[in-house]
UniProtKB/Swiss-Prot annotation:
Binding site for ATP: 67-74
Similarity comment: Belongs to the RecA family.
Keyword annotations of the record: ATP-binding, Cytoplasm, DNA damage, DNA recombination, DNA repair, DNA-binding, Nucleotide-binding, SOS response
Superkingdom of the organism of origin: Bacteria
Protein name, per record: Protein RecA
Swiss-Prot/TrEMBL GO biological process terms: DNA recombination; DNA repair; SOS response
UniProt cross-references to HAMAP family, sorted A to Z: RecA
Role summary: Can catalyze the hydrolysis of ATP in the presence of single-stranded DNA, the ATP-dependent uptake of single-stranded DNA by duplex DNA, and the ATP-dependent hybridization of homologous single-stranded DNAs. It interacts with LexA causing its activation and leading to its autocatalytic cleavage.
Gene this protein is translated from: recA
UniProt source species: Baumannia cicadellinicola subsp. Homalodisca coagulata
GO cellular component terms listed in the entry, alphabetical order: cytosol
Keyword Transferase: no
Compartment(s): Cytoplasm
Example of a GO MF term: ATP-dependent DNA damage sensor activity
Location (main, coarse): cytoplasm
Length: 350
C-alpha cells in the first residue's frame, strides 16, 4: 500500500522523537519485532509442552495455574523450577501458603541450595518482593503459591469477621499493572498458583471461579487448568495420579489443547512414560505384543521396564525427546500422532 510522501516524513519524525524520548524499541512495526519468537521454559512434561504449542511456558509473561486441591499445581511448578535450574536460570519461590516441603522439592530435582525462598506476612509484601526481584533483572523464574493466600495487610490487621470486599482484587489489579512491563523488560517468567471457588446460586454454566478477581485472568498470557482424573496403581497400592491439564488461555499459540500425563508420588511427572506413549503413537518406538523396540533393538518387555530402561539410558531418552519435539512442535502438518494432545472437547487431534 502506497503512503503519501509527506505522511512518511511525518511518521519518520514522530518515530524518531518517540525513540529519543522513550528509548530504542519503544515503537516498531509488528513485522520487524524479532522478539516474536518467544523464549520458553519446558514444563517438565513433553505432552504439556506440545499442548502449549511454543514448547513450554513463555519468558517475560504471567502464567496462572489453577485447579482443585491435590491436583498437582505445586508439583508442576517445582518441575518448571527444576528444568529452569538445569539451564542455569535463577528461580525464586514465594511461599505465601507457608507449606513448601524442601525434601519433596529436592526429590523432584530442584536445587534447593540455589532456590530463593520467601514466606511473606502479607499479600502486599509478597507482590513487592516479586517486583523487586523482577526489576533486579537477575531472576528468571518466580513462583507465587498461591493467590488465595495473598492476604491484604488490612485484613490481617483487622478482626475475624470484618468485611473487606474487593480488597484482594484491588491489590492484584494494582500489582498486575505494575509487574507486566517489568517482567517483559527483565524477561522474567512469573507463575501464580491459584485455587478454585464455587459461585453461589449459579444454575447454568460452570460455577467454578478463581480467587483474586479478574485482573490475573486478563494479564495472564497462559492459563492452565490442572485436574486429577484417576489413580496410578501397582497392584492394590496407589503410587500416583493420572493428571489432565487444559490450556484454557494461550497468547503465544493456539489455546484449548489438553495434555494427559502421570504424576508419581514423591517423584513428580513420569517423563519416561510420556516418551514411551508418544514414541509408540508416532512410530518412533515399535511395539509387538508386550515388547518394545527402538531402531530395531529391543528395549524392554512391558511399559514399566521400558521406562526403567530409558531412566538408566538418559542419552537415548534425550534423543527420543528431541525427535518428538522436532516432529510435533515444528511440523506444520498436523497428524494423528498428536495423540496425547487433545482439544477442548476431549477428542484427539487429527
Amino acid at each position: 500500500m502506497a503512503i503519501d510522501e509527506n505522511k512518511q516524513k511525518a511518521l519518520a519524525a514522530a518515530l524518531s522523537l518517540i525513540e529519543k524520548q522513550f528509548g530504542t524499541g519503544s515503537i516498531m512495526r509488528l513485522g520487524e519485532d524479532r522478539s516474536m519468537d518467544v523464549e520458553t521454559i519446558s514444563t517438565g512434561s513433553l505432552s504439556l509442552d506440545i499442548a502449549l504449542g511454543a514448547g513450554g511456558l513463555p519468558m517475560g509473561r504471567i502464567v496462572e495455574i489453577y485447579g482443585p486441591e491435590s491436583s498437582g499445581k505445586t508439583t508442576l511448578t517445582l518441575q518448571v523450577i527444576a528444568t529452569a535450574q538445569k539451564e542455569g536460570k535463577i528461580c525464586a519461590f514465594i511461599d505465601a501458603e507457608h507449606a513448601l516441603d524442601p525434601i519433596y522439592a529436592k526429590n523432584l530435582g530442584v536445587d534447593i541450595d540455589n532456590l530463593l525462598c520467601s514466606q511473606p506476612d502479607t499479600g502486599e509484601q509478597a507482590l513487592e518482593i516479586c517486583d523487586v526481584l523482577t526489576r533486579s533483572g537477575a531472576v528468571d523464574v518466580i513462583i507465587v503459591d498461591s493467590v488465595a493466600a495473598l492476604t491484604p495487610k488490612a485484613e490481617i490487621e483487622g478482626e475475624i469477621g470484618d468485611s473487606h470486599i474487593g480488597l484482594a482484587a484491588r491489590m492484584m489489579s494494582q500489582a498486575m499493572r505494575k509487574l507486566t512491563s517489568n517482567l517483559k523488560n527483565a524477561n522474567t517468567l512469573l507463575i501464580f498458583i491459584n485455587q478454585i471457588r464455587m459461585k453461589i446460586g449459579v444454575m447454568f454454566g460452570n460455577p467454578e471461579t478463581t480467587t483474586g478477581g479478574n485482573a490475573l485472568k486478563f494479564y495472564s498470557s497462559v492459563r492452565l487448568d490442572i485436574r486429577r482424573i484417576g489413580s496410578v496403581k501397582e497392584g492394590d497400592v496407589v503410587v500416583g495420579s493420572e493428571t489432565r491439564v487444559k490450556v484454557v488461555k494461550n497468547k503465544v499459540a493456539a489455546p484449548f489443547k489438553q495434555a494427559d500425563f502421570q504424576i508419581t508420588y514423591g517423584k513428580g511427572i513420569n517423563i519416561h512414560g510420556e516418551l514411551v506413549d508418544l514414541g509408540v503413537k508416532n512410530n518412533l518406538i515399535e511395539k509387538a505384543g508386550s515388547w518394545y523396540s527402538y531402531n530395531g533393538n529391543k528395549i524392554g518387555q512391558g511399559k514399566n521396564n521400558v521406562c526403567n530402561f530409558l531412566k538408566y539410558h538418559p542419552q537415548l531418552a534425550a534423543e527420543l525427546d528431541k525427535k518428538l519435539r522436532e516432529m510435533l512442535l515444528h511440523n506444520t502438518t498436523r497428524t494423528e500422532s498428536n495423540s496425547l494432545v487433545r482439544d477442548d472437547e476431549g477428542t484427539f487431534d487429527e
